[in-house]
Amino acid sequence: MDLKALIRDIPDFPKPGIMFRDITTLLNSPEGLRYTIDSLVEQCESQELVPDHVVGMESRGFLFGMPLAYQMNAGFIPVRKPGKLPAPVHRVEYDLEYGKDSLEIHQDAVAPHHRVLIVDDLIATGGTAKATAELLTKLGCEVLGFAFIIELAALNGRQCLPDLPIISLVEY
């Protein structure tokens, strides 16, 4: 299946010069959604990635991470922007092109030696995925790899990630 055909391009969003890759059209296709999740599962299995938990990054990582976790018989853990989780959290700060940002995870979400797979809809510069991996590693988890639907290859995001398996289904 041609997933690119199911991803809508929106020029100049959210600002001029940006080509936004809109996955809502993919999500709207039952066949496309099933193919996407099945493809992620197949690639994880072929690389022997068997997580205890799938970690989805806010917010579109939730859309693909939860069905992937279900199919892989794993738990799902959200990593969120600050102030979105109600219980005590662990936090990691990371650099953006113009400033800083941070991510949080519930303190009781993971335990040392949990095997985790990090999922998001898209990898661009890799900063968010890298920060998520650093946080989980600091908490004693074994990060097995990363899974993305879209990879913006020109931004070299995979270069900043740890030397682990990286799955991406569509490359721009």
Swiss-Prot record:
Reaction(s) the record says it catalyses: AMP + diphosphate = 5-phospho-alpha-D-ribose 1-diphosphate + adenine
Subcellular location: Cytoplasm
UniProt xrefs under CDD domains: PRTases_typeI
Any one GO biological process: purine ribonucleoside salvage
Known role: Catalyzes a salvage reaction resulting in the formation of AMP, that is energically less costly than de novo synthesis.
NCBIfam families: apt, PRK02304.1-3, PRK02304.1-5
Protein name, per record: Adenine phosphoribosyltransferase
Organism listed in the record: Synechocystis sp. (strain ATCC 27184 / PCC 6803 / Kazusa)
Gene name for this UniProt entry: apt
